[in-house]
């Protein structure tokens, strides 16, 4: 079982903690992580893109001129794709971009990403984050204690997690939520990951 230093909110070491080997000791699997990230991003797409074909554009039911005898090219509708104001050929239609992935593979991706964060020293375990009130400056002070100036993800399982979420949401590049919201995209996207025990 991997041992990591346990910190307090001031950035000082407060002891050691053993992490579960089945979660934080998993071999790095880039392919599964990539598949999970692509799946999550694809599932967030609305897929409402649409264009009108010649059958959907309003008008064009009447033949503009007779077939023969005018000297002009034959035409059956003013909504032909060749005409200005006509329909679109092979344009996008509404569809689902959803991708599927087995539960075990999704879990493996999260475990693999968390294990890699630990190996890269980008995972910081904090004993508790207790903000009395939602104050942005408290999170700024907390991040400064760990010399974090880039992207940071705070996963707070404590009782005051709502205060943490509200305090962090006004800082660019910083996100905070309860453990139930943890997802593969955020683990990969944010440089530093803070976990409370």
Can you name each region flagged by the protein language model?
Residues 1-46, 91-197:
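Extended polybasic, low-complexity segments that bind anionic RNA or targeting/receptor surfaces
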